[in-house]
Amino acid sequence: MNANLNAAAAGQLVLGADLKVNRLGFGAMRVTGRGIWGDPPDVATAVRVLQRAVRLGVTFIDTADSYGPEVSENLIARALYPYLPDIVIATKGGLVRPGPGDWNHDARPAHLRKACEASLTRLRRDRIDLYQLHAPDPKVPLEDSIGELVRLKSEGKIRHIGVSNVSVAELERCERLTPIVSVQNRFNLEDRDSDDVLAYCERKAIAFLPWAPLGSGRHASGSGSGALRALGRVADSHGITVGQAAIAWLLERSTVMLPIPGTGSVEHLEQNIAAASVRLSPQDMHALQ
């Protein structure tokens, strides 16, 4: 593996005018057990993955209290505390996990307050750099949920506010209450349903964090749909893996894009970081339209 691997090769992005991060981050959902439930199969390996990510130039780490639940946040603190000064930790609240496979909404203000304060404790932070509403709750007015995050920010517990799994209309409602510095929606080569949200983020200089940037693993083979076959051909032309080509496509797709591929493997992490140095040509991007 190239000794010069560095996430900084992807360039930088500024969150909220004051948090500069390298534009290839790390999603910490996979440092948990099967089904994003419980401890990872090998805790020591999960710790090494997190530490290696930082050594390879990752300065933005995304997690959520529901990953494990609580496991991912605890492992981040175990692996990285005391944090280097340039490390930005983002977490999320608003989904609860009563059991494996269950993802239930709870974005009531009281729950978000309790969740944020618990995340502060687990992450061993005085203030969360970026706190994201994990998803709008159909039973709670969006303004109530975001309003509580605004109060937490005014109390110094949150530095910046982001949202996840939102439409343009929902994002506009949030922005009427407070500046939104990031949006985290599902987005990858095959799933571009959030193209309109990405376009809005570009107009407003809001960071766009694509979750499932590798299509939940579907991009590993480069076979299947026409888009994936085209991705396989682009990967072959650059001598890289299909997964690396998928990350490179995201980085080239928009300057507000901040991919956060996750993994529980050091080897896979290094492959992902190598994608920061890949430059796709206009011809490549046309082939992947």
Which residue ranges define each predicted feature?
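Acidic (Asp/Glu)-rich catalytic clusters
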Residues: 16, 55, 77-88, 120-124, ...
